[in-house]
């Protein structure tokens, strides 16, 4: 017998079966992700005095030039960045610490994890309505509890200096349970023998956390950070219901401004320009986080 040829190995036949299985996912991505992004990019190079497509005219990068001279847009983008930082500092860090504490609780950890995940199941609109009542300076229980312990209540959603933090607390309350579950899943893949070896070497609890847990949870941390960045940058519904960007636009984010320009004013091209810039910022931040983690992995 002669040596097998590339045709004998099946390389000459086109196997369509894998493409059939991934076709639904590709169609979904094409229709709901890539087409809207491409459409927004195209719209951003046009403008219309009436908002109708038949009145579109080419402006090139005119919308982008106007956008970066728009102080309100830049202020909204700044609020988005602050929101990202708060979302990393509060729910992500809290979720990681709770996951580590629950890791050694045996069967009860699933019960606690389920309890922590309950806020994640509450719709953002419902959460915003409930927390508006909690924050209410007249009838809300938060100020009432503060007064009981001798502290002064505050108009949480009417104070420009704290409103963004107050609204972010609502989002953090809803989101931290998701972080707990992801980190708990990652902790299941860490062998207990590594902790035993660290104890033998004299490592304390903090040393085990920083030199065993954190490095081995790197993939889970990257996923949560990227997911948090994407979710925080396009946040909209909770702020829309809780404050509608007020007071005095102190809690306005880019998503809310896109809604105002498109749905209220009919400036779809300008809103599309904002969407394009927001997409670029999200991709840039995500790439920075991923590259930083990958670089650290290569150095290790």
Where are each of the predicted segments found?
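Membrane-interfacial, low-structure loops and terminal tails that flank and connect transmembrane helices
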Residues: 2-8
């Amino acid at each position: 017998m002669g040596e097998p040829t590339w045709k004998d190995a099946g390389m000459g036949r086109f196997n369509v079966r894998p493409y059939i299985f991934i076709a639904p996912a590709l169609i979904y991505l094409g229709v709901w992700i890539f087409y809207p992004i491409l459409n927004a990019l195209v719209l951003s190079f046009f403008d219309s005095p009436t908002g109708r497509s038949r009145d579109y005219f080419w402006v090139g990068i005119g919308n982008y030039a106007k956008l970066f001279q728009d102080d309100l847009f830049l202020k909204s983008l700044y609020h988005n960045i602050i929101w990202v930082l708060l979302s990393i500092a509060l729910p992500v860090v809290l979720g990681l610490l709770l996951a580590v504490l629950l890791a050694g609780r045996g069967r009860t950890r699933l019960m606690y994890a389920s309890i922590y995940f309950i806020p994640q199941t509450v719709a953002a609109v419902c959460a915003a309505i409930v927390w508006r009542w909690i924050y209410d300076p007249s009838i809300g229980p938060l100020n009432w509890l503060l007064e009981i312990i001798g502290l002064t209540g505050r108009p949480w959603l009417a104070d420009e200096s704290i409103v963004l933090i107050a609204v972010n607390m609502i989002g953090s309350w809803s989101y931290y349970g998701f972080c707990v579950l992801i980190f708990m899943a990652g902790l299941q893949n860490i062998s207990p023998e590594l902790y035993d070896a660290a104890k033998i070497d004299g490592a304390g609890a903090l040393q085990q956390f920083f030199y065993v847990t954190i490095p081995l949870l790197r993939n889970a941390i990257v996923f949560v950070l990227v997911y948090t960045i994407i979710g925080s940058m396009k946040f909209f519904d909770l702020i829309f219901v809780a404050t509608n960007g007020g007071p005095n636009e102190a809690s306005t984010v880019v998503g809310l401004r896109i809604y105002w320009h498109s749905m209220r004013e009919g400036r779809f091209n300008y809103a599309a320009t904002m969407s394009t810039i927001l997409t670029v910022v999200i991709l840039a931040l995500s790439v920075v986080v991923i590259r930083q983690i990958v670089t650290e992995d290569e150095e290790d």
